[in-house]
Amino acid sequence: MLSKRIIPCLDVRAGRLTKGVKFEGNVDIGDPVATARRYYEEGADEIVFYDITASHEDRGIFLDVVERVASEIFIPFSVGGGINTVDDMRAVLMAGAEKVSVNSGAVKTPDIISQGAAAFGSQAIVVGMDVKQVEKSATIPSGYEIVIHGGRKYMGMDAIEWAKTCESLGAGELCVNSIDADGTKDGYELTLTRMISDAVTIPVIASGGAGSPEHMYDALTRGGASAALIASIVHYGTYTIPDLKRRISGMGAKMRMVW
C-alpha cells in the first residue's frame, strides 16, 4: 500500500502568503518562502504553490518567488496560476518546480494537458479543478460544476466528466478543490472526492476544508484520495505536520513519517 501524502498549500498574492474562506476575504499571513521552508523541515511530503490571481489578472506567475521557494526545499514542489502555454510550463519547471498545475488554462485550452505531458511527461502535469456544488441538470449530471478564474466564472462543465477528460489527455494527477468547503475547516467534500477518485485511475488530491486530522483521514480513506492538501490547519498553528502524521497514522492510514 502506497503511503498517503500531506501537502501544504501556499496561496500567494503579490508575493505574499494569503488565505481566505471560499475564495473570499483573503488576508496576509506571512512570507511564502519562510513558510515553505518550515513545512519542508517539519516533514511535508510535497509543497503546492498557487499564484491565486495570475489567471484573473491575465499575467504570468511570480517566478522570482517560485525560485526562492525552490531553493529552500528539497521535496516535490508543484506550482500553478496563470499557466496557459507549454512555454509557461517550461518557465515554471526551469524556476525549480517538479510539477506544474494547470487549471483555468486547461479548461480554456484542453490540449495544453496533452502538449505538456508530451513535452515533460505526465508525472509533471497536475490538473487543478475548482468545483462548486450546483443543481443537477442534463449538463451537470453529477451536481458538481467546474469554475475558473478563482471561482469567478462558471463553465457549464460537469466535474466528473472533466476529470475523465483530463486523464485521457495525459494528466498525471488531479487536485480537486471544493470551493464550498475551502477554508471552512469543516471537512473535505467527501462525495465529490470519492466520485472523482472512482472515475479515474490517476492519483487524486483532496483539497478544501481540512480542520482536523480526522477530516484528513476521511479524505484519504472514505474519499479515496491519495493525498490531502492543507492550508489553514497549519498556517494558523492549529497543528504541525508531525502532529498530523502521527494522528492519521494512529487511525490506520499509512504515512511517510520521515522524508
Swiss-Prot record:
IGPS catalyzes the conversion of PRFAR and glutamine to IGP, AICAR and glutamate. The HisF subunit catalyzes the cyclization activity that produces IGP and AICAR from PRFAR using the ammonia provided by the HisH subunit. It is found in: Cytoplasm. Belongs to the HisA/HisF family. CDD domains: HisF. Pathway: Amino-acid biosynthesis; L-histidine biosynthesis; L-histidine from 5-phospho-alpha-D-ribose 1-diphosphate: step 5/9. Keywords: Amino-acid biosynthesis, Cytoplasm, Histidine biosynthesis, Lyase. This is Imidazole glycerol phosphate synthase subunit HisF. Its EC number is 4.3.2.10. GO terms for molecular function: imidazoleglycerol-phosphate synthase activity; lyase activity. The active site is at 11, 130. It catalyses: 5-[(5-phospho-1-deoxy-D-ribulos-1-ylimino)methylamino]-1-(5-phospho-beta-D-ribosyl)imidazole-4-carboxamide + L-glutamine = D-erythro-1-(imidazol-4-yl)glycerol 3-phosphate + 5-amino-1-(5-phospho-beta-D-ribosyl)imidazole-4-carboxamide + L-glutamate + H(+). It comes from Nitratidesulfovibrio vulgaris (strain ATCC 29579 / DSM 644 / CCUG 34227 / NCIMB 8303 / VKM B-1760 / Hildenborough). SUPFAM superfamilies: Ribulose-phoshate binding barrel (SSF51366). Coiled coil: none annotated. One of its GO terms (biological process) is L-histidine biosynthetic process. One of its GO terms (cellular component) is cytoplasm. Heterodimer of HisH and HisF.
